[in-house]
């Protein structure tokens, strides 16, 4: 408990010593600066001419060749699979 009171006392005394020094520097008048001998020369802002940029073009894309739609062909007749021919067409009787 004694160390706690001692630390508070040291803190309070250091605050009393340091704070007025900070206030003293705060309320001082600003340092005197003599005026410049010549007024600054007004120069118009430097403008560079615009740079010509070509219009933006997309890079070429390799597209596959366009195939023409196939010509309509009649459907191929395939022989029936897994089915016996009708008996009328059977010549082996």
Swiss-Prot record:
GO biological process terms held by the UniProt record: cell wall organization; nodulation
Bias-annotated ranges (Basic and acidic residues): 46-93
CC terms in the record's Gene Ontology section: extracellular region
Xref: PANTHER family: PROLINE-RICH EXTENSIN-LIKE PROTEIN EPR1, REPETITIVE PROLINE-RICH CELL WALL PROTEIN 3
Principal localisation: secreted
Sequence repeat segments: 34-38, 39-43, 44-48, 49-53, 54-58, 59-63, 64-68, 69-73, 74-78, 79-83
Organism: Medicago sativa (Alfalfa)
Span list, region 10 X 5 AA tandem repeats of P-P-[HQVRT]-[HKNT]-[DEKR]: 34-83
Localization in the cell: Secreted, Cell wall
Positions of the UniProt region annotated as Disordered: 30-93
Protein keywords: Cell wall, Cell wall biogenesis/degradation, Nodulation, Repeat, Secreted, Signal
Tissue and organ distribution: More abundant in the young nodules than the mature nodules.
Signal peptide: 1-24
Family to which the UniProt record says this protein belongs: Belongs to the plant proline-rich protein superfamily. ENOD12 family.
Protein's name according to its UniProt entry: Early nodulin-12A
Function summary: Involved in the infection process during the plant-rhizobium interaction.
């Amino acid at each position: 408990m004694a160390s706690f009171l001692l630390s508070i006392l040291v803190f309070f005394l250091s605050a009393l010593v340091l704070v007025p020094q900070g206030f003293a520097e705060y309320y001082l008048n600003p340092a005197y600066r003599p005026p410049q001998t010549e007024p600054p020369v007004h120069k118009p802002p430097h403008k560079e001419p615009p740079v010509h940029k070509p219009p933006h073009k997309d890079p070429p894309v390799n597209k596959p060749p366009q195939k023409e739609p196939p010509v309509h062909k009649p459907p191929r007749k395939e022989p029936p699979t897994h089915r016996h021919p009708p008996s009328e067409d059977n010549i082996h009787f």
